[in-house]
């Protein structure tokens, strides 16, 4: 029986799987895929504070390539419920538009690929199709999601040959953008120290704010690069500055700033650390610099599979897709270490927003695109 991707999307949205809580979403998908002949492994990873539920499901033969669809069932918080037109977990359809948290990012894409798979005659598939579904991509415990599943796959001799991720990559219309790489993301914490004192007697104090302002000014006026053929220029944003000082007549002794740099493959996190460190040292010796990396940049050269996806998009929508590396980080930063990866999904305009929504027509189109891609990948009949 062929699955209706919109009905399935409504059902999946009804699970309030706010990261890292699963609330039954993974088991629901496991039950659906089991009915279609998939061997399903529900995988729980975590620590004393949290457990993240994930799913790996596969069907087919080990003789040929394994085409994997990767996604996540966790969603971000809803925000003020009174501002939503409809219950964000009702999967409500109004005027042929599906509303709900996860409608765009990215439950509908998961359902579209499941619908596509339900149309495939597996007797003709010279390989296997699999699903890698994470229960925490949006939150702080992502290490117990896709990275842990990939480790499990390696330990249990499951090999993925190519992966498509259903992140919402489209911008103005469905099919205008596919992701063939991602920028890196590095976060810096800058601490400047001074001497606390009374604002009326500044000569007895040392205000660390002055040095921090100078440091941030230099950073904001630094051209890290001008980009290249595949990536836009690296950019830096100040995300917070705080002294923790609530007194109006006290010069603080410490100030902390957080900055984030989204960077291309001209840099590494360490080369950017050197740049920021040198700027700080030019201003004052009284500083500390810490950094953490969310993901390094990567780029996949166009290949036969990305050409197949572009062809499938063209056939269904009539549009030519643009290959892009823009946007934030995704689980592709982990999967790219295992196999080539590409990302394609719905329009991202309302992702994470109040009244997140998608036209039902585009869910059907996405299922059609995924179906065509699967057929081309395995050289199946496209009639």
Swiss-Prot record:
GO process annotations (BP): diaminopimelate biosynthetic process; L-arginine biosynthetic process; lysine biosynthetic process via diaminopimelate
Recorded catalytic activity of this chain's protein: N-succinyl-(2S,6S)-2,6-diaminopimelate + H2O = (2S,6S)-2,6-diaminopimelate + succinate
Domain of life: Bacteria
Keyword Magnesium: no
PROSITE patterns xrefs: ARGE_DAPE_CPG2_2
UniProt: Zn(2+) 1 binding residues: 72, 105, 167
Top-level enzyme category: hydrolase
Similarity annotation: Belongs to the peptidase M20A family. DapE subfamily.
HAMAP family: DapE
Name of the protein this chain belongs to: Succinyl-diaminopimelate desuccinylase
Species of origin: Ehrlichia ruminantium (strain Gardel)
């Amino acid at each position: 029986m062929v699955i209706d991707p919109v009905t399935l999307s409504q059902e999946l949205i009804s699970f309030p799987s706010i990261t890292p809580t699963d609330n039954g979403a993974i088991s629901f998908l496991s039950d659906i895929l089991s009915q279609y002949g998939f061997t399903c492994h529900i995988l729980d990873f975590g620590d004393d504070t949290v457990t993240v539920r994930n799913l790996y499901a596969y069907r087919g033969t080990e003789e040929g390539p394994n085409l994997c669809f990767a996604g996540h069932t966790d969603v971000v918080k809803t925000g003020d419920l009174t501002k939503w037109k409809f219950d964000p977990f009702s999967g409500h359809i109004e005027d042929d538009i599906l509303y709900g948290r996860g409608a765009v990012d990215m439950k509908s894409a998961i359902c579209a690929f499941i619908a596509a798979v339900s149309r495939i005659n597996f007797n003709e598939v010279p390989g296997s199709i699999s699903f890698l579904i994470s229960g925490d991509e949006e939150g702080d415990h992502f290490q117990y999601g896709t990275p842990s599943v990939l480790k499990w796959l390696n330990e249990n001799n499951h090999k993925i040959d190519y992966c498509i991720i259903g992140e919402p990559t489209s911008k103005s219309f469905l099919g205008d953008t596919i992701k063939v790489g991602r920028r890196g993301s590095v976060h810096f914490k800058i601490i400047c120290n001074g001497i606390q004192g009374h604002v009326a007697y500044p000569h007895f104090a040392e205000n660390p704010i002055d040095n921090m302002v100078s440091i941030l000014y230099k950073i904001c006026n630094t051209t890290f690069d001008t980009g290249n053929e595949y990536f836009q220029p690296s950019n830096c944003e100040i995300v917070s500055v705080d002294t923790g000082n609530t007194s109006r007549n006290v010069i603080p002794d410490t100030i902390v700033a957080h900055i984030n740099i989204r960077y291309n493959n001209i840099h590494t996190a360490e080369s950017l650390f050197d740049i920021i460190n040198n700027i700080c040292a030019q201003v004052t010796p009284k500083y500390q610099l810490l950094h953490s990396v969310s993901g390094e940049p990567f780029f996949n050269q166009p290949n036969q599979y990305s050409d197949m996806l572009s062809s499938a998009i063209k056939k269904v929508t009539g549009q030519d897709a643009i290959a892009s590396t823009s946007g934030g980080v995704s689980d592709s930063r982990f999967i790219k270490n295992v196999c080539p990866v590409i990302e394609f999904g719905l329009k991202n305009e309302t992702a994470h927003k109040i009244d997140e929504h998608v036209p039902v027509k585009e869910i059907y189109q996405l299922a059609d695109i995924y179906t065509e891609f699967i057929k081309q990948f395995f050289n199946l009949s496209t009639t």
